[in-house]
Amino acid sequence: MSWIKMYVPDLDVTAQEYTDAMTLSGTKVEGFEKLDADLDKIVIGQIEKIEKHPDADKLIICQVNIGTETVQIVTGAPNVKEGDKVPVVLDGGRVAGGHDGQKTPGGIKIKKGKLRGVESFGMMCSIEELGSTKEMYPEAPEYGIYIFPEDAVVGESAIKALGLDDVVIEYEITSNRVDCYGVLGIAREAAATFDKKFVPPVIKETGNDEKASDYVKVTVEDPELCPRYTARVVKNVKIGPSPKWMQRCLASNGIRPINNLVDITNYVMEEYGQPMHAYDLDTIEGREIVVRRAKAGEKFVTLDGQEREMDDQVLMICDGKKAVGIAGIMGGENSMITDNVHTVLFEAACFNGTNIRLSSKRIGLRTDASGKFEKGLDPNNAKAAIDRACQLMEELGAGEVVGGCVDICNEVREPSRVPFEPERINALLGTDLTKEEMLAYLAKVELTLDPETNEIVAPTFRQDIHCMADVAEEVARFFGYDKIPTTLPNGEATTGKLPFKLRIENVARDIAEYCGFSEGMTYSFESPKVFDKLRIPENSDLRKVITISNPLGEDYSIMRTTTLNGMLSSLATNYNRRNKAVRLYEIGKVYLPKALPLTELPDERTHFTLGMYGAGDFFDMKGVIEEFFEKSGMKKKVHYTPDSNKTYLHPGRQANISYEGKVVGYLGEVHPLVAGNYGIGERTYVAVIDIQDILEFCGFNHKFTGIAKYPAVTRDLSMVVPKHILAGQIEDVLEQRGGKILESYQLFDIYEGAQIKPGYKSMAYSVVFRDHEKTLEEAEITATMKKILNGLTALGIELRS
């Protein structure tokens, strides 16, 4: 909280009060931690005298002045000497944990005692025992007691001197509030919440009589991806530690202090929410910065020592000859700052958020900077941040700031304007506020009224203000959500329902599960090797795939164009686990590119896939499909056309599924070689239906008919049929010639054997007739059967005797 109080000096609330109020006003606090929660009675003491312990070679006896008295403390620390100022926990006080850095809940209470016969009235502390780490306090020894600087005041609180009397607060900042990604934004919200004055840092003009433009030239080749780029130069740089107050601020935000130069860039990033970068200007070839897109396949070594390959969508920061950084993500190893740096080039820029997000994913590198840039920063913030960094360099004596700033501004962001409608705001909130009251609340967060246009003007850092509802939210936040009166809605409720496509998918699930299939879910990304495994030809459209730019691995590097691999892999897993009979289904998407390389979004198709082994055959699969079609409202006949073109299916046991002349899927037995590739030793059957292809035929306008009053009459047809005649052709004859009295038919037998002449097969149908208005007469049935038999005879079919 101390960092917040630097900009809201009158803020005087407890951590709990702060947390509750900030959350209620819209800046949600996840939690807070008091750094001194487990510390008590710890003061700065000065060692006046050290003596050897009479009975222990590794212990010493120290006389320590704690301001009010001198106490005797026995310690084994090897790093203390007479005159050192150290943290001392007194009798009855508490430390956070042991020297191993492990905190103890509630702390460890220190009592006076004897060490090898010598009384000790307290304990000198390491930084770990105070609940912190050497990373946060670089000056602390690797092992031993923490030593204060010479100007530390004996007797004062060691907790306060170390900055451990602070509270670390964790916020949950939504992505639309980019202004709150910096401490200044949070402080502005705190000032508004507690009605205190917000005092931002005053940035003074810095720099000598020289011009930065004489030191470096900047060219932005892609203004769309880099709306603003600012650069300033600092020469005669002196690398050293940053001041303690800056180190404490960074440590509270989880950033390890390094040196004054690095700490200043990190400090400004945390303060303004504006990422910065520093280059050693002497490593910049030609003293020139060029912001350009990477070349496809260009390789670059980042600060973390990793070589990364770019594509032509990644924005690079380059000098006259080479790349020196990935824009908005990370700098390069070839321009990193060392302790020997003489002249520094500061960069503060605004990059296209969408491009940074996609680039970060492509190269597999996400940083604090990219996380901020991808939200979309205010271009107007870059200049303020770089000037602040130069001001700190000058104030801390870290270098000589060169005058002027190279500022390439390709986008001037104007304040957003929203019509001010008090009546609508009151109606939306259910309040009765006056115009003046609303304006007072809005003024807290720098939203002002333009009286000439009657518009609310939002500063450029508030890019979340777009419409009247956004303005109403700001009024509600500071009026108080808890003060808004409770009212009941008076509108009419409407019944919601699932989209039509999802209803069809649910029918598919219901039918599949009713028929004994279990649902499976497989990855949408696969290995390019699956096409060979499935025996898919090299020229097949299924091999035209979308390659993932940042895959989990080679086995997940493409978007699938068929669901068969996932289904067969799942069946294989069950087969290997010795499950003897398995039925699975999946409803999942395939991704079919319209053109490669991608210029538009792919065609995403939803496939209903069935797979089984040891639990049925080709005809069982047909039955499931027909049941699904019927329950989806597809009442017309389904046609199965033999096919032999799908190389992953058995050439003599596969068929395309058609409805009203449109191919909507296929089914068949998996080719034995493909089944073997997956390690399945059983006959395996699959079916695939394209959900999008059947939607135009589906419907849920069910018609109900009463129970039939009149009896049905059944006739069996046993026929000798040429082998090339399909069951569908016979059924077409039945439907066309059966008339209105034909109720249903069912194929119940197919036979080929010695008793049937060569080139023929035996087929038998059960045909049901019924008239819903009267009892059928034998003459009607005979006449209808004659029509049917004539139609069958025309196909070369003979009736068996």
Language model features with spans:
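Conserved mixed alpha/beta core segments that line enzyme active sites in large multi-domain catalysts
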Residues: 44-74, 154, 248, 259, ...
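Terminal amphipathic helices with adjacent charged low-complexity linkers/tails
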Residues: 194-220, 397-425, 432
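Extended, well-folded interaction surfaces typified by the phenylalanyl-tRNA synthetase beta subunit core
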Residues: 418-580, 715, 768-772, 776, ...
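Mobile "lid/hinge" segments at catalytic clefts and subdomain interfaces of large enzymes
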Residues: 116-131, 140-144, 159, 167, ...
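Beta-rich nucleic-acid/ligand-interaction surfaces
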Residues: 36-40, 205-208, 493-494, 498, ...
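A carboxyl-terminal module marker
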Residues: 444-446, 594-598, 603-609, 615-801
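Phosphate-backbone binding interfaces of nucleic-acid-interacting proteins
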Residues: 1-210, 345, 364, 368, ...
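Glycine/proline-enriched, intrinsically flexible loops and inter-domain linkers
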Residues: 7, 20, 60, 198-298
